[in-house]
UniProtKB/Swiss-Prot annotation:
Gene responsible for this protein: Lrrc55
Domain LRRNT: 35-65
Database matches in InterPro entries: Cys-rich_flank_reg_C, KCNMA1_auxiliary, Leu-rich_rpt, Leu-rich_rpt_typical-subtyp, LRR_dom_sf, LRRNT
GO BP: potassium ion transmembrane transport
Protein's organism: Rattus norvegicus (Rat)
Membrane topology: Single-pass membrane protein
Protein's name according to its UniProt entry: Leucine-rich repeat-containing protein 55
A GO CC term attached to the entry: voltage-gated potassium channel complex
Annotated PANTHER family: GH08155P, LEUCINE-RICH REPEAT-CONTAINING PROTEIN 55
Residues annotated as domain LRRCT: 196-251
Length: 298
């Protein structure tokens, strides 16, 4: 019997087997911790955390550290606390659509350097500040559509987003968009701007020229982009405007115009002097007449 056991092959040094068991247990504990940290009312699987359609009023705490895809869509979330994404450096997709967000805290994406897709549509955002996407240089897609109170986009709101390909600003409250906000987006392919109350005055001309120059690379929803003002172009498609539409913005004065203005100014000056002279004479006469009446009464 002893000889039989002696002839059996030994699987290896005891310390190697112990190390193998240790690593397996450690991996199991780590996996168990990641699964155990799934928030209540959420489902967690394959680095995807789905907390959508749960009527949440606040963001869930303590997500799995390796979360790559986080959906908080279709809830009633009104605010995201500062530093909420600090620990989730693997985050690639963040879906916050259809909530009650009015603003986002500064530096929210400071540590989300791998974030590529961000959906903030169907919220109540009123403006996009300069520091909103700071450090989130990996963003490829941003959806800000259907924010009816969105009135202003800071000229440097998208600064540094060199990889951004898709930007949706449709169906908001934008009447004006600074050209500077788009010029720093070399990779932009799709831009949606329809459904906004655009004021197609002189300030719109630079943006329209830029869009026309980029139209083969930047596909804008030209059929939905309409002017809400001034009255003479109200209801006109934005891309139907031509250089003639902005002719009044480039009026130049000729020599005859300057001579006419000078003549009118001269006439007005003479009329003013004559009027002052007549008023002076009238006042003097009234004074003398009043003084004469006083002497007669005495």
């Amino acid at each position: 019997m002893g000889d039989t056991w002696a002839q059996l092959p030994w699987p290896g040094p005891p310390h190697s087997a112990l190390l193998l068991v240790f690593f397996l247990l450690a991996a199991g504990v780590m996996h168990s911790d990641a699964g155990a940290s799934c928030p209540v009312l959420c489902t967690c699987r394959n680095q995807v955390v789905d907390c959508s359609n749960q009527r949440l009023f606040s963001v869930p705490p303590d997500l799995p550290m390796d979360t790559r895809n986080l959906s908080l869509a279709h809830n009633r979330i009104a605010a995201v606390p500062p530093g909420y994404l600090t620990c989730y450096m693997e985050l690639r997709v963040l879906d916050l659509r259809n909530n009650s967000l009015m603003e986002l805290p500064p530096g929210l994406f400071l540590h989300a350097k791998r974030l590529a897709h961000l959906d903030l549509s169907y919220n109540n955002l009123s403006h996009v500040p300069a520091d909103m996407f700071r450090e989130a240089h990996g963003l490829v897609h941003i959806d800000l559509s259907h924010n009816p109170w969105l009135r202003r986009v800071h000229p440097q709101a998208f600064q540094g987003l060199v990889h951004l390909r898709d930007l949706d600003l449709s169906y908001g409250g934008l009447a004006f968009l600074s050209l500077e906000a788009l010029e720093g987006l070399p990779g932009l392919v799709t831009l949606q701007i329809g459904g906004n109350p655009w004021v197609c005055g002189c300030t719109m001309e630079p943006l329209l020229k830029w869009l026309r120059n980029r139209i083969q690379r930047c596909t804008a929803d030209s059929q939905l982009a309409e002017c809400r003002g001034p009255p003479e172009v109200e209801g006109a498609p934005l891309f139907s405007l031509t250089e003639e539409s902005f002719k009044a913005c480039h009026l130049t004065l000729t020599l005859d115009d300057y001579l006419f203005i000078a003549f009118v100014g001269f006439v007005v000056s003479i009329a003013s002097v004559a009027t002052n002279f007549l008023l002076g004479i009238t006042a003097n006469c009234c004074h003398r007449w009043s003084k004469a009446n006083e002497e007669e009464e005495i």
